[in-house]
Amino acid sequence: MLKSQLQQQLKKLKDNNLYRFLRKNNSYNNKNYLDFSSNDYLCLSTNKEIIDAIKEGGLKYGFGSTGSRLTAGDINHQLLEHKIAEFKGTERSLIYSSGYATNVGVISALCKKGDLILSDKLNHASIIDGCKLSKSAVLIYNHCDMDNLIDLIEKNRSSYNNLFIITDGVFSMDGDIAPLDKLKKIADEYNGILIIDDAHGTGVLGNGKGSLKHFNLKPSDNIIQIGTMSKAVGGLGGFVCGIEEVIEYLINTSRSFIYSTSLPPSVVSGCIKSFELIEEGAPTKKLQKNIGLANKIFKEHNLIEENNLTPIYPFIFKEKTMDIAEQLIKNNIFCVGIRYPTVPKGMERLRVSITVGHSEEDFRVLCERINLIIKKKFKGI
């Protein structure tokens, strides 16, 4: 019964061109393979100093953590938490096994029945799932639309206890930045708490410190910062930063923290070194220089209209997106095609991620191949 049901559902996905599958990424085996899909913005996943730190951590502490943080799995983890809190300028931080686990664990623990969540329409799936797991009422405001947000708050605020405004710092599919300065003012005015998922802002904006620093905003009692170590940091895991009471409460109530085996200590050692390198500033400066170069070249080839501040570029090709992505692979370029339900129908795009490892020639090759594919296969778009 289950097998036949799943077969029918999989067939439906294939018929609607929505079927997902795992593809072998040859970029590590083929030096002629251009990778524009990676979130390793600062190329720290292959940094020698970090790899040496990982080796040292493995030799010192062993392969795995062997337990959750509240049992046997608290090894060098508090050293990393101290480093992250120092880096972000907050009282405390807490690390989780992934960015997804962080959002789900933080939101479901803090947001309760009788509370109200206002969530941006384009927030990451992990935020959406965290909201679903909470007992709070959830309202969605139009993407970065402050008037719509204020309208929803004024119509609903008086009926609830705590107000939570939740947003990505940098939106993962479009690369745009949430107006945190305006969101902070709104949170202050309506006695709300602002939760920022800065997965794609940490290491990228604000001299590496993230989206909050980009707006010259300081951490405060009503701001909770969430991040990941799997993007610019180049490693694995997630973290949350905030005041002492928030972190202590999460240690006692956040289920994805309490019931997960902690990160391997070797990974923790690598992440500590990575934050040290990011704090020096050089990797982020190099990335911003490359973003400026990419802006220039992508504009020349009519692939973008406005300059980006982040390394995420959406090239919207709608229903032709997946075909273009397949043709790029045949041309030794890995650039992920993103389609519904990750993005709305009619907004299918190539999600181009640039890193410090890309050169001017790499950007030009990508543009030329895309335009050639469009010309040959689609007779232009």
UniProtKB/Swiss-Prot annotation:
PROSITE patterns: AA_TRANSFER_CLASS_2 (PS00599). Pathway: Cofactor biosynthesis; biotin biosynthesis. Its EC number is 2.3.1.47. Pfam families: Aminotran_1_2. InterPro entries: Aminotrans_II_pyridoxalP_BS, Aminotransferase_I/II_large, AON_synthase_class-II, AONS_Archaea/Proteobacteria, PyrdxlP-dep_Trfase, PyrdxlP-dep_Trfase_major, PyrdxlP-dep_Trfase_small. It is an enzyme of class 2 (transferase). The modification N6-(pyridoxal phosphate)lysine is found at K231. Keywords: Biotin biosynthesis, Pyridoxal phosphate, Transferase. One of its GO terms (molecular function) is pyridoxal phosphate binding. Substrate binds at R20, H124, T342. It catalyses: 6-carboxyhexanoyl-[ACP] + L-alanine + H(+) = (8S)-8-amino-7-oxononanoate + holo-[ACP] + CO2. Its cofactor is pyridoxal 5'-phosphate. Pyridoxal 5'-phosphate binds at G99, Y100, S172, D197, D198, A199, H200, T228, M229, S230, K231. Homodimer. Catalyzes the decarboxylative condensation of pimeloyl-[acyl-carrier protein] and L-alanine to produce 8-amino-7-oxononanoate (AON), [acyl-carrier protein], and carbon dioxide. This is Putative 8-amino-7-oxononanoate synthase. It comes from Methanococcus aeolicus (strain ATCC BAA-1280 / DSM 17508 / OCM 812 / Nankai-3). The gene is bioF.
